[in-house]
Amino acid sequence: MSVTTMEVSTESDPGHPLNGLSLKQRSARAGDRSPGFDATAARRFLDLLQTPRTGCVEMRVLRAAVDRQGWVRRGDDIGGGFGGSTIAGWFDDGQRLIDEARRLRGVSGYVTFNPARSDLLARSDNRLTRARHTTRDDDVLCLRWLYLDIDPLRPAEISSTETELRAAIARRDAILGDHPEFAASGAWGCSGNGAWILVRLADYPNDSQHAALLVEALAALDQQYSDNIVRIDTATANPARLIGLPGTLKAKGCNRPDRPWRRVTLEGSGTQQFDRLQSG
């Protein structure tokens, strides 16, 4: 896997535009020159989420603000002591979502992977705005995906090292190898700091019985594949869960050479439905 990193040095240039900025502000500006937005990956992913076309998708950016040029950045990098707020929009037009994702600079972009009720379009119709409310679990129309978030263990709010990232990707590939039905019915990629798998379900009803099946499946996978290096997140079963949008940047902490910001990727997908989740 090719990983793009970036190092910024300003010590020998008093007039450099990054001088006088905080470390976080430097990281935000550095994010402008980190791996760019991959619209093709975003489009492929959105097509997977919305086949068949059902409801809408929420896109969300956390602790963010819009600068004077219209870019969406970290709130604490805009200045004025503002820590940022939740910015969100609901989309039934994939191209409009991609157009909004192009505005992100040094912030992570997330989407809901299960279809949400179309009524939510009335909050922010195919555009990003400051949001007081976001998609709730009971706004989800059906359980379309089982989400495996495979992350290397590390301190909170920092990006992974290359070694940590490779460990997570190797664990993902082991899961796909042990469960070929996941590869046949799922999609997978790199989350920027770890790896992910989405397993396509048969649009289960969004009820407690079927939600419990997802919880049990994640617990079983966690028991089999988690250790003191990589873990399977068991908290991803809630219907309104978010996933990093492929093609966008995962920007945790500061953009350092040893823990760089990286792009979320979509590396493969199958075409079948997995319909064998059973209790016990």
Placement of each model-derived feature along the sequence:
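N-terminal compositionally biased, intrinsically disordered segments and leader/signal-like regions
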Residues: T5-M6, E11, L266, Q272
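Signature for HUH/AEP ssDNA processing cores
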Residues: M6-T10, H16, L21-N193, R200-A220
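A common structural junction motif
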Residues: L218-I229
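Catalytic "initiation/cleavage/transfer" segments centered on a nucleophilic residue
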Residues: N228-G280
